[in-house]
């Protein structure tokens, strides 16, 4: 590892610039994986909708009433139940198989990236990265947000199956036509199926794919850092207004490798990563985005000149935020938290709990009633 001040400075600069650029690639790669899995789900949902429409049309009114009460008393009702159950099993196979393959490939790539990251920052020989299979197995044996990755994905088909049953039963009870039931379940093509009950599954696939990939990446980094003798890591959050208050508050926090400490992902869709620290202040440049949604969703003619730029990599998120216009600060914090921040002396990290959850206004008031009474009594 670097052993003089200038070498540490250069090493830290190389590392932070490389890892912040890499996280952009990771987000795009995750988007591609989400798109593949959602497209596969949409195909399965289309097949289900077609078969359901045919089956429902063949049911007598008495059979529809029985289905709504959870009774499968005829061959046609049993056939409908089997159709839904088998479809849910097909969904489970598709989701778990596709994601497992993707995560194992990612594990190997990320371990290689972490090794290259350290190798480019230091002089001398660097050990080989852990094998992809070993990293993947390690990630599967570690919880992410308190759950195992496999369990998180197994819940998707179970919940989706429940949604299908519930939507059909509710539709029958409400007197909807079969066509209306199918439309409410799947949604409409004109709205890209976002108006259907099954949009929950599409969103959950998005959430879990991004979260599980973030988990595998960070396990790959940690295993590789430890194998290479890195002693300390630092949390590196994304500098934009999409970041959560928890990640904004812990940007720059350091941890000893090989000890029990908090690890990303800190929440669903978390973009924070842990970079190797060489005992020096973080140097170089890191990008920022003054936006509350992805840049790709903002028309070019609506992007201010200073919306995208760079700051010193040693700048922590709260320091960057303190220099932003009051209008942006208020929008990100909300009016009450903004007053606490500007006049109550609150730091960003005070708006979240130790587990990463954002504290509600009521919880903040209960914790610091004196400040609330002073600030908001003055305002009234």
Spans of model-derived segments:
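N-terminal leader/targeting and assembly helices and adjacent pre-domain segments
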Residues: 1-191, 285-380
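Acidic, glycine-rich two-metal-ion catalytic cores of nucleic acid-processing enzymes
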Residues: 182-185, 191-290
């Amino acid at each position: 590892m670097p052993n003089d001040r200038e070498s540490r400075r250069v090493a830290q600069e190389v590392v932070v610039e490389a890892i912040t650029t890499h996280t952009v690639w990771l987000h795009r790669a995750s988007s591609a994986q989400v798109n593949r899995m959602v497209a596969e789900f949409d195909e399965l949902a289309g097949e289900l909708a077609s078969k359901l429409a045919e089956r429902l049309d063949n049911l007598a009114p008495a059979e529809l009433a029985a289905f709504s009460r959870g009774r499968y008393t005829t061959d046609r009702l049993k056939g409908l139940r089997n159709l839904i159950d088998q479809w849910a099993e097909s969904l489970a196979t598709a989701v778990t198989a596709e994601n497992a393959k993707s995560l194992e490939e990612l594990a190997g790539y990320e371990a290689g990236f972490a090794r290259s990251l350290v190798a480019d920052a230091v002089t001398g020989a660097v050990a080989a990265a852990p094998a992809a299979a070993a990293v993947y197995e390690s990630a599967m044996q570690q919880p992410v947000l308190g759950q195992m990755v496999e369990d998180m994905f197994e819940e998707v088909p179970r919940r989706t199956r429940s949604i299908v049953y519930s939507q059909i039963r509710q539709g029958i009870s409400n007197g909807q036509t079969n066509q209306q039931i199918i439309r409410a379940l799947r949604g409409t093509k004109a709205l890209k199926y976002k108006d259907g009950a099954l949009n929950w599954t599409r969103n959950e696939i998005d959430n879990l794919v991004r979260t599980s990939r973030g988990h595998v990446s960070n396990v790959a980094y940690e295993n590789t850092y430890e194998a290479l003798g890195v002693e300390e890591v630092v949390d590196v959050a994304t500098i934009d207004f999409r970041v959560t208050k928890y990640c904004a508050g812990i940007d720059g926090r350091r941890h000893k490798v090989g000890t029990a400490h908090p690890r990303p992902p800190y929440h669903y869709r978390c973009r924070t990563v842990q970079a190797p620290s060489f005992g020096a202040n973080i140097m170089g440049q890191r990008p920022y985005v003054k936006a509350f949604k992805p840049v790709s969703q903002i028309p070019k003619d609506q992007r201010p000149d200073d919306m995208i730029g760079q700051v010193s990599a040693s700048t922590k998120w709260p320091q960057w935020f303190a220099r932003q216009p009051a209008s942006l600060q208020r929008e990100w914090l909300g009016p009450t938290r903004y007053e606490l921040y500007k006049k109550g002396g609150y730091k960003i990290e005070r708006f979240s709990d130790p587990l990463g959850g954002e504290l509600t206004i009521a919880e903040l008031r209960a914790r610091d009633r004196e400040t609330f009474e002073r600030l908001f009594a003055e305002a009234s």
